Amino acid sequence: MLARSRFILVLVVGALLAVLSFSLQYLHLIPTNPVAEQRSAGRSRKRVNPVLHTDPPAPDPIRDTHQYCNYPNLTEHGWEGHCPPDYKLLSVQVMIRHGDRFPLYSIPKTKKPTIDCILSEKRKPSHPLLASFISHMALGGRGHWDASLGSLPRLPSHSTCEMGELTQTGVVRQLKNGDHLRQAYISRHNLLAADWLPRQLWAETTGKSRTLQSGLAFLFGFLPHFDWSRLTVRQQWSTLFCGQSCDCPARNRYLDQEQRRQYRQRIADAELERTYVTMAKTLGVATKTLRAANPVDALLCHFCHGLPFPCSSTQTSSNAPDEGACLTLEHFAVIRRQQKDDELERREAGLYRRYAVLAAHPYLNRSAARLERIARGSQMRKSKEDAVFALASAHDVTMAPLLSALGLEGAGFPKFAARLVFELWSSPETKERRSDRKLDNMFIRVLYNGEDLTFDTAFCREHNRRSTQPLCPLGNFLSFVRKDMFSVVNATSYQQACHQTVL
């Protein structure tokens, strides 16, 4: 009897479930054939992850400024010295921007930032080579100095920094950069032997103490305790490093046009104008006076050194100044935002690129000629005939047009202690290559702050990286420097481009 009751109960429950299932299907509350519906959605049953289309993050002027400061406590990384196996490093040409410096301008009615420019290994930031670097600079009289460089101080020397003076932060950053390239080129590739010859090292700088001192700090990191008697430091009289080829009227006209574009862009920026008015009112000066003082230069120094932004020095109270009488991070962010906007507009306008091609050509031409001599000397088994390592210690106004001329406008404005590197490599020679004097086995790499940008350059953007030769042929660079780069200004040579009419 009990078993019969259980059987009847099971039948009733089963019937109820059947009716419920039929009802749901009839009312389309569940799919009748989920597998078939899945198949009808597409031929492939492979799971496809959804692609989220999100807008790129908005530019952050404060984050970008941290990168510009180039703090020396950041670990140095880079792809310098990396190449396929069996390739040989023949030469390295480096341009650096000077390191962190004291402002070139002062903001009216504010106190200058208090920064000690006398070097001390006991003060941060420091470096294991700093103490020996200080001692080694005292022996600089044994070196060979071009023009007026011998009279410049080889170390920063003021307890309160002077205008434009290199800071200890700048020195330490250059020591680190030089040490990084020492590991990449000397430890790994033996680019310069311990008994290197004077003609194998080329060093040049402008007549500013900050570029001379930056170059010496970099060299000491690269060649610790180098022999002064083997070093000659040459002076470039122009910040463009144009040597004997500085006469270029068209270049100056392009620069005038670009500066007028910059001015129009600034005065059209309503937020920037309101910010200048507010800053001027805060300090009690005329707006045009504040704008002429280029306040971003001094504010960058405060920001990079973690100092409070300047306040009006006309406070009557000896206590801390009122917050309303001080410049703020918000003021600074607006100015930096406008500078980033200007970089984008400058790229679109194209005027700066034309100026840059003519400004950078003399330096690029000398570098190209040096690399070609070294390449041909290597083919003819003539070694140690030219500078296998060349250093140019320069300014932002030197490096910025160089980047633009190379087609690297997206690389950004040169930060403190920025470095631009040209590497010359040779691949293993075949029997066919040994019989001719072509440069088919010579290649170039271009690196900016450690990042390989070779295939972003104008002369190697179209090179097939998946070809039998994964590097950029040196011939591409030589052709670019000697002719192709002038297509931007509708010319075929430097002389023609410099003396044509600019409307």
From Swiss-Prot:
Its main location: Golgi. One of its GO terms (cellular component) is Golgi apparatus. It is a single-pass type II membrane protein. The active site is at residues 98, 396. InterPro entries: Acid_Pase_AS, His_Pase_clade-2, His_PPase_superfam, Histidine_acid_phosphatase. Keywords: Glycoprotein, Golgi apparatus, Hydrolase, Membrane, Signal-anchor, Transmembrane, Transmembrane helix. The keyword Transcription does not apply. CDD domains: HP_HAP_like (cd07061). Its EC number is 3.1.3.-. One of its GO terms (molecular function) is phosphatase activity. Glycans are attached at residues 73, 365, 490. It comes from the Eukaryota. Residues 1-6 are cytoplasmic. It is found in: Golgi apparatus membrane. PROSITE patterns: HIS_ACID_PHOSPHAT_1. GO terms for biological process: chondroitin sulfate proteoglycan biosynthetic process; glycosaminoglycan biosynthetic process; positive regulation of heparan sulfate proteoglycan biosynthetic process. Belongs to the histidine acid phosphatase family. Responsible for the 2-O-dephosphorylation of xylose in the glycosaminoglycan-protein linkage region of proteoglycans thereby regulating the amount of mature glycosaminoglycan (GAG) chains. Sulfated glycosaminoglycans (GAGs), including heparan sulfate and chondroitin sulfate, are synthesized on the so-called common GAG-protein linkage region (GlcUAbeta1-3Galbeta1-3Galbeta1-4Xylbeta1-O-Ser) of core proteins, which is formed by the stepwise addition of monosaccharide residues by the respective specific glycosyltransferases. This is 2-phosphoxylose phosphatase 1. The gene is pxylp1.
